[in-house]
C-alpha cells in the first residue's frame, strides 16, 4: 500500500525516503548501500523500508464500482 510515514518502533520519519530508496536501487546500489546513503542506521527503520510491499498500483486495477453497474 502506501509507505508508513513513521517507523512503527522508534517513530522516526521514513515516509519521505521511499522514492529516494527506489531511485538508489535503480542506480545499481544494493539494499544495504541504499539504506546507508539514506541515513537509516536503526534496524527497525531499515526493516520498515525493506519489508514494504507497494501494492497501490495493483489495487487500482480493481474498481468495485464497475461491478455495481450491472445491478
Swiss-Prot record:
SS bonds (residue pairs): none
Principal subcellular localization: nucleus
Subunit-structure text: Component of the RNA polymerase I (Pol I), RNA polymerase II (Pol II) and RNA polymerase III (Pol III) complexes consisting of 14, 12 and 17 subunits, respectively.
Highest taxon above the source species: Eukaryota
Keyword Zinc: yes
GO MF annotations, alphabetized: DNA binding; DNA-directed RNA polymerase activity; zinc ion binding
Binding site for Zn(2+): 7, 10, 44-45
Alphabetical GO biological process terms: transcription by RNA polymerase I; transcription by RNA polymerase II; transcription by RNA polymerase III; transcription elongation by RNA polymerase I; transcription initiation at RNA polymerase II promoter; tRNA transcription by RNA polymerase III
InterPro entries xref list: RNA_pol_su_RPB10 (IPR023580), RNA_pol_suN_Zn-BS (IPR020789), RPABC5/Rpb10 (IPR000268)
Native source organism of the sequence: Schizosaccharomyces pombe (strain 972 / ATCC 24843) (Fission yeast)
UniProt subcellular location: Nucleus
Protein name: DNA-directed RNA polymerases I, II, and III subunit RPABC5
One GO CC term on file: RNA polymerase III complex
NCBIfam families, sorted: PRK04016.1
Record keywords: DNA-directed RNA polymerase, Metal-binding, Nucleus, Transcription, Zinc
Family under the similarity heading: Belongs to the archaeal Rpo10/eukaryotic RPB10 RNA polymerase subunit family.
Function per UniProt: DNA-dependent RNA polymerase catalyzes the transcription of DNA into RNA using the four ribonucleoside triphosphates as substrates. Common component of RNA polymerases I, II and III which synthesize ribosomal RNA precursors, mRNA precursors and many functional non-coding RNAs, and a small RNAs, such as 5S rRNA and tRNAs, respectively. Pol II is the central component of the basal RNA polymerase II transcription machinery. Pols are composed of mobile elements that move relative to each other. In Pol II, RBP10 is part of the core element with the central large cleft.
Amino acid at each position: 500500500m502506501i509507505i508508513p510515514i513513521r517507523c512503527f518502533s522508534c517513530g522516526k520519519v521514513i515516509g519521505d525516503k521511499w522514492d529516494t530508496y527506489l531511485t538508489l536501487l535503480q542506480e545499481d546500489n544494493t539494499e544495504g548501500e541504499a539504506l546507508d546513503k539514506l541515513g537509516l542506521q536503526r534496524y527497525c527503520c531499515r526493516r520498515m523500508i525493506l519489508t514494504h510491499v507497494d501494492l497501490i498500483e495493483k489495487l487500482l486495477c480493481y474498481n468495485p464500482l464497475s461491478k455495481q453497474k450491472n445491478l
